């Protein structure tokens, strides 16, 4: 599956911004049919960084959200800066 079709956009809120700083995690809205393995591979292909784990949930609006924990220190901040979140 194409990595660009799996990861749709970053999920931005006060909670996700705190996770970027405190827990080295970044949150994205992803394709509903994607599983954790596909999300992990797509993220590693797009951003060239090692993923420790992926947690997913479906929001009441029907969007699938993936919280991705990164291995390297401050990697979430670097990716957020590249995406223009800050």
From Swiss-Prot:
Assembly state and interactors?
Part of the 50S ribosomal subunit. Contacts protein L29.
Disulphide bridges, residue numbers: none
> What protein name applies here?
Large ribosomal subunit protein uL23
NCBIfam families the record matches: PRK14548.1, uL23_arch
Per the similarity annotation, which family is this? Belongs to the universal ribosomal protein uL23 family.
Which terms in the Gene Ontology molecular function aspect does this entry carry? rRNA binding; structural constituent of ribosome
Q: What function does the entry list? A: Binds to 23S rRNA. One of the proteins that surrounds the polypeptide exit tunnel on the outside of the ribosome.
A GO term from the CC aspect: ribosome
- Would the keyword Ribonucleoprotein turn up in this protein's UniProt record? yes
């Amino acid at each position: 599956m194409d990595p660009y079709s799996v990861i749709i956009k970053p999920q931005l809120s006060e909670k996700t911004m705190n996770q970027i700083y405190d827990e080295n995690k970044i949150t994205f809205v992803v394709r509903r049919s994607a599983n954790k393995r596909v999300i992990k591979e797509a993220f590693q292909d797009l951003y060239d960084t090692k993923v420790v784990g992926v947690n997913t949930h479906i929001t009441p609006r029907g969007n699938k959200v993936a919280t991705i924990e990164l291995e390297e220190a401050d990697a979430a901040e670097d990716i957020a800066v590249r995406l223009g979140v800050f």
